[in-house]
Amino acid sequence: MPVRRGHVAPQNTFLDTIIRKFEGQSRKFIIANARVENCAVIYCNDGFCELCGYSRAEVMQRPCTCDFLHGPRTQRRAAAQIAQALLGAEERKVEIAFYRKDGSCFLCLVDVVPVKNEDGAVIMFILNFEVVMEKDMVGSPARDTNHRGPPTSWLAPGRAKTFRLKLPALLALTARESSVRPGGAGGAGAPGAVVVDVDLTPAAPSSESLALDEVPAMDNHVAGLGPAEERRALVGSCSPPPPVSAPGPHPSLRAHSLNPDASGSSCSLARTRSRESCASVRRASSADDIEAMRAGALPPPPRHASTGAMHPLRSGLLNSTSDSDLVRYRTISKIPQITLNFVDLKGDPFLASPTSDREIIAPKIKERTHNVTEKVTQVLSLGADVLPEYKLQAPRIHRWTILHYSPFKAVWDWLILLLVIYTAVFTPYSAAFLLKETEEGPPAPECGYACQPLAVVDLIVDIMFIVDILINFRTTYVNANEEVVSHPGRIAVHYFKGWFLIDMVAAIPFDLLIFGSGSEELIGLLKTARLLRLVRVARKLDRYSEYGAAVLLLLMCTFALIAHWLACIWYAIGNMEQPHMDSRIGWLHNLGDQMGKPYNSSGLGGPSIKDKYVTGLYFTFSSLTSVGFGNVSPNTNSEKIFSICVMLIGSLMYASIFGNVSAIIQRLYSGTARYHTQMLRVREFIRFHQIPNPLRQRLEEYFQHAWSYTNGIDMNAVLKGFPECLQADICLHLNRSLLQHCKPFRGATKDCLRALAMKFKTTHAPPGDTLVHAGDLLTALYFISRGSIEILRGDVVVAILGKNDIFGEPLNLYARPGKSNGDVRALTYCDLHKIHRDDLLEVLDMYPEFSDHFWSSLEITFNLRDTNMIPGSPGSTEWEGGFNRQRKRKLSFRRRTDKDTEQPGEVSALGPGRAGAGPSSRGRPGGPWGESPSSGPSSPESSEDEGPGRSSSPLRLVPFSSPRPPGEPPGGEPLTEDCEKSSDTCNPLSGAFSGVSNIFSFWGDSRGRQYQELPRCPAPAPSLLNIPLSSPSRRPRGDVESRLDALQRQLNRLETRLSADMATVLQLLQRQMTLVPPAYSAVTTPGPGPTSTSPLLPVSPFPTLTLDSLSQVSQFMACEELPPGAPELPQEGPTRRLSLPGQLGALTSQPLHRHGSDPGS
C-alpha cells in the first residue's frame, strides 16, 4: 500500500473554519451571497436559529438584512446602515432592534463583514449577531409581533424611549457648526443628492418599501439647515414626506425573488419607510459620531463628493479581511466607489424619481471607519487565522515543515533504514568480537579515528540519528480525522507522545560521553541500545505488509538477523569461559585443536576472529533449522543451556515461517490481490476509453481514498452472508449516528429504525465531486454526516450545507420524482447517507403511525426540486397536492368527487368563465354558451395552487349550433331554476345522463351541429341520491363514500340497459334498410322519394322503439331507485331530464313508417 497521505486534495474549508472559530464562542452568524439579488442567506448556524426562533429551513434564501426579524421598534436608520454596508461592501457595526418568531423584542449588535475570493472580489458577507439587551426586560409593553400592522398606542412610548437614549448626543449639536451648506463642500447642495444615513427615529408601519438597491429621496432643504434649526428638526419637528408618483396607497411590501425561476424564497429585501420623514443629521451614522464631531469646530475643506474621500480611504484599505489582501494591495479601482449612480440601479415604481441623475453621497471617512476601529478578525475573535477566503485551498503547510509523503522524506527514510540495518548487524558484532580483540592485542597507535574505520562510521550514524530527530520535529503527520497536521507545536506534542524516547536513547553517542574512561566493555554494552531503532524499522516496513513477497523477504531477513545475534552470543559465552577453564573442553578449544591453532597457557593464540564468527554462525543456523551435524557441539553447561534456548527459538521460527510459507503467502496476497485487481480494472478502463489525464487522476485518487476508507471490503457482499435480522442490527449500528440525532427519526420504533437502516446507503465524495447535476432526477434524500457541500445554479452559490443538513425534495408533496434545479458539489471530503425515494415510501407504508410524525418533523434544508421543468407544477394535481390521496384512490372519478367535497360552494366564487352554469357566467355578455367554435378546450383538471376555489370539472361534449338566448344552453336545454340558484349543486344525475341524451339527439338531428368541450357544473357528492338536488349541505365522508358506490352501481346498470337498447335500435335500422319485398308479397317496390311511401295497412306505432322514447326510458330506469320523497326538477320546454311515464303519451303521435312487405305486419 502507498503511504497514507491523508486528505491532501484541495478543499474549501471556508465553512469549517468559520464554524470552528465561532462555535466555541457561542457566536450567532449567517453567511450571505453577495453575487445574487438581495444577498440571500446561504448558511446560518444553530446559534442564530436559537436566537431568532426560526429553523434553518425557514432562514435559508431569505435576505441577509433579516427583514423577517423587523418589527414596530426596528429603527429604519439602523436598517438603512445595514443595507448601505451591503451596498458598499464595507465593514460596519450596527445596533438594531429585532423580533423573534414568538414576538419578543431584543436589541442586537450586528457586525457586517465582507468576504473576498482569491481575486479580491467580495462574494459573501458574514453577519454576526450579538444580543445587547432584551427589550422585554426594560419595561416594554406586551410582546409585539414581527408582522407589520397599523399604528397602535405603543408607538408613542417606543418613540419616546428611543429619543431619551439619543438626547444627550443630540444636545451636543449646539457646540458645533453645521457641516452642511447650501451648494457647499460635499455636494450637499447639488440637485438630486441623497444623504444615506439620515433618520434617527424608529420606523413606523409604512405603505412604501425600499429594496436594497434603492435609496429614498429626501428634501433638499434639509441640507441647508443651521445648527439650531438642525437640532430643532431632530428634537421635535418633522418634515412632510417627499412626493410620490401616485397619491393612492401602495403595498407595504414589495417582493424581490432571488431568482424568478427558483422556488426557494418569496420574501423581499425591503425596509419600511415612514410616512413622516423627520429631519436628518448629515454625515452622522450614530449618536457617538455626533458626539465625536463636536470637537471639530471648523467644517471640512471643500471637495467634490465623488473624489473628496478617496485619499483617506486608501489608508483604510490596509485593514484587510482576507488572505489575498494580506499578500497584495488591491488598487483603488477594486473597492466600491464613493458615488453610485441611480442609472445603473433598478428603479422603484412606487417612488418618484427626478429626471436628473441621483447620487448617493457616501458618509465621510470617519463615519465609514468609526464603527470598525479594529480588524474584523479581532472583532470576531478569529485568533491568529485571518478570515478565510471562499475558494478551494490546498492544505496550508507551515514554513520549514516537511510533508511526510514528500520525495525528500522518502529518501531520508530509506537512508535511516540502511543505517539501522548497519546498527543491527555491526553493534552486536563489535561488542562481542572487536572489543575483546582490542583488549588482547597490542596497543594501538595514537592515530585517533583514522585507524578505526568502524568508529568513524559509528560517529556518522550517531550524527544522522540526531538529525533524524530534528527532522521528525518538523515532519507532518495524519491525525485520526485523516487530516494532515503541519503545525509545529502539534507535531512536537505528537512526537513526544510517540517515538521520541526510543529515538533519543538510540541516538546517544555513548563512546563520546565516556571517552577515555577505559571501560570498553561498558561502551559496547551501551551501544546495543541502538537496536531500539529496529522498532522504527518495523513501523516503517509495516506499510509493505500488503505485499506477500515483501513479507516473506522480511521474515527471511529476520531469521538471518536472529541467527547473527545468536552467533555473537555463542562466541561471547565461549570467550568468557575460556580463560577460567582448567579442562580444555570448550567449543573454542575444540575449534583451535581442529584447525591446528590451539590456545596456549596464557589464553592467547587460538583461531582468528573470522574463523570464530563463521563457526558460531554455522552452529546457530544448524540449530535453528534442526539440522545439527555434530561437528560443533556444546560441551560446558553454559553452552548446553544456550543450545537448548536456540533449539526452542529455532523450532518456533521453523514452524512459523518455513512450515507455513504457503499459508503466509496466500493470506498476505489476499488483500493485495484484491487491491491490484481493482486497480488493474480501473487502469484498463482508463486505457480502453482513453480517459484524459485530469479525469484519470481523479479516478485513481478516489479509488485509493475509497480503498483506504473501506480497505476493499464490499459491505453488501459481507452483509449478504448473514441472516436478515443480523443484517438489520449491523445496519442499525452503522447508521446509529444519523438515526439517533436526526429529528425526524426520533419518534420511530425499533422495528421502524431497523427497516430504515436497511435502506440507507453511505456515499463518500472527495472535494470537487458533483453529487447531483442540474436536471438530474431526484430519486433519493441525502443526509450529510461529515464535510460540507455547496449548491450552485450556474456559477452562483445559492447554499452551503454542512453536517446534519438535508437536501433533496419533499417526497410527501409530489407523487413523482422531480428534477434538480442546481448542481450539488462537495467542498471537502464528505460522508452522506442517502435513501431512495421508493425505499423510504415503502417503509413509511409499512409503518403508517410513524409516517405523519416523519413528514411533520422533516425539515429539508434546501429543496432541489425544479418546479419549472415539469408540466403542471408546482400545483398540478397530476404531480403534487394530495399525494396520500392519490396513493389511496386510483379512480379519477373519486379524486374529482373528493375535491368537490372539500370545496363546496366554491364554483360561484371563481369569477366569470370558471363555472359553466353559474350565474356569473350567464350574466356576462358572450358567456360560455355563446363562445365561438374555435375556443380551445378547458383543462380537465385545474391546479390546486391556482386558487382556493378552483376544483376539477369534467368535460362533456355538447352540441353547438347557432347562437341561442343567453339563458338557454346548447341543445335547446335552458338552465333550470334550481341550478341557477345554486350553481355548485347542479343535478348530478342529469349531468351524468345528459351524455346519453345527447347521443340520441345527435342521431335524431345532426344537421348543422358542431361539438366542443365545455365545462359542466361540478357535481358535489352530498347531493346524490336521497336529498334535495338543490341542497348545498355537506355530509360526512362515510356517507359520501356510500353514495358514490350507489352511484357507481346505477351507472353499471345504465350501461347494461343502454347496451340492450342499442341492440334494439340496430335491429330496427336493419329492418328499415330492407328495400326489396319478398317474392310472396303483393306489394311493389317503393319509389325513390323517401316520403312517397305509406303503409298499406294501418299499423299501430311502437313508442318504445323511437329514439326519443328510448332516451326517456333509459333515464327513467336509472332513476327508478330514487326515494318517493325526492323532488323533481321543473321542466322548461323540451327538456328531458328525469323524464316520467306521463310524458310518453305525447310521443305516440308520430307513427313509425314501415313497409307493408314486413313479415311482422
Swiss-Prot record:
- UniProt keyword list: Cell membrane, Coiled coil, Glycoprotein, Ion channel, Ion transport, Membrane, Methylation, Phosphoprotein, Potassium, Potassium channel, Potassium transport, Transmembrane, Transmembrane helix, Transport, Voltage-gated channel
Q: What does this protein do?
A: Pore-forming (alpha) subunit of voltage-gated inwardly rectifying potassium channel. Characterized by unusual gating kinetics by producing relatively small outward currents during membrane depolarization and large inward currents during subsequent repolarization which reflect a rapid inactivation during depolarization and quick recovery from inactivation but slow deactivation (closing) during repolarization. Channel properties are modulated by cAMP and subunit assembly.
What's the name of the protein? Voltage-gated inwardly rectifying potassium channel KCNH2
- Give the organism's phylogenetic lineage: Eukaryota, Metazoa, Chordata, Craniata, Vertebrata
Which positions fall inside the PAS domain? 17-88
GO MF, one example: inward rectifier potassium channel activity
Signal sequence: where?
A: none
The record lists the organism as: Oryctolagus cuniculus
Residues that bear Phosphoserine: 239, 245, 285-286, 322, 353, 873, 876, 1139
